[in-house]
Amino acid sequence: MRIILLGAPGAGKGTQAQFIMEHYGIPQISTGDMLRAAVKAGTPLGLEAKKVMDAGQLVSDELIIGLVKERIAQDDCANGFLLDGFPRTIPQADAMAANGISIDHVIEIDVPDEEIVNRMSGRRVHPGSGRVYHVVFNPPKVEGKDDVTGEDLVIRPDDEESTVRKRLGIYHEQTKPLVDYYGKVAAEGNTKYTKFDGTQSVAEVSKLIQAALS
């Protein structure tokens, strides 16, 4: 089963991706994770990507397509995969089709912008462990401190409100057209397309996705 997850940054795609991956036994291919790994490793591409992401911009198609093509050629993708955060644009979707990468089901998780701003700008991260908190939904025991080590929590540059709003603007401009694109592909019978209300509970959204995929 080859699945694409669509939705704005902060819509909860990562959480649902985890559910789908475990439930169906297919790997999640998150361009964000691939990019963060490159940034952490300090590779030339990683450093270039960090500069772009910190400014709230999107990295080049060339870099992302190279990473994705390499990844889905691996053995664990033989039974399918879940793409999270790719394609972002119609040219990327066209490039996938041109490379013979067919998709069985496209899932969109829809959340209003203001809800996303509240979700993302409230995130706090412990740099040493990667533990993530939220000032409203999952606060640390002591404000601004990691529960385990007591060390300071930080706001990732891409969780700053101004950066979140900039990324949402880019999403609406570049990625929203994919909704129409895959709607047409589905109408032609070449994939299935389902939209979900992402403001519902995580468990409810998971249940609805499972029903749509079965």
Swiss-Prot record:
Gene3D superfamilies: P-loop containing nucleotide triphosphate hydrolases. It is found in: Cytoplasm. GO terms for biological process: AMP salvage. Residues 30-59 are annotated as: NMP. Residues 122-159 are annotated as: LID. InterPro entries: Adenyl_kin_sub, Adenylat/UMP-CMP_kin, Adenylat_kinase_CS, Adenylate_kinase_lid-dom, P-loop_NTPase. It comes from the Bacteria. ATP binds at G10, A11, G12, K13, G14, T15, R123, V132, Y133, Q200. PROSITE patterns: ADENYLATE_KINASE. Pathway: Purine metabolism; AMP biosynthesis via salvage pathway; AMP from ADP: step 1/1. GO terms for cellular component: cytoplasm. Its EC number is 2.7.4.3. Keywords: ATP-binding, Cytoplasm, Kinase, Nucleotide biosynthesis, Nucleotide-binding, Transferase. Pfam families: ADK, ADK_lid. NCBIfam families: adk, PRK00279.1-1, PRK00279.1-2, PRK00279.1-3, PRK14527.1. Consists of three domains, a large central CORE domain and two small peripheral domains, NMPbind and LID, which undergo movements during catalysis. The LID domain closes over the site of phosphoryl transfer upon ATP binding. Assembling and dissambling the active center during each catalytic cycle provides an effective means to prevent ATP hydrolysis. Catalyzes the reversible transfer of the terminal phosphate group between ATP and AMP. Plays an important role in cellular energy homeostasis and in adenine nucleotide metabolism. Belongs to the adenylate kinase family. This is Adenylate kinase. It comes from Shewanella amazonensis (strain ATCC BAA-1098 / SB2B).
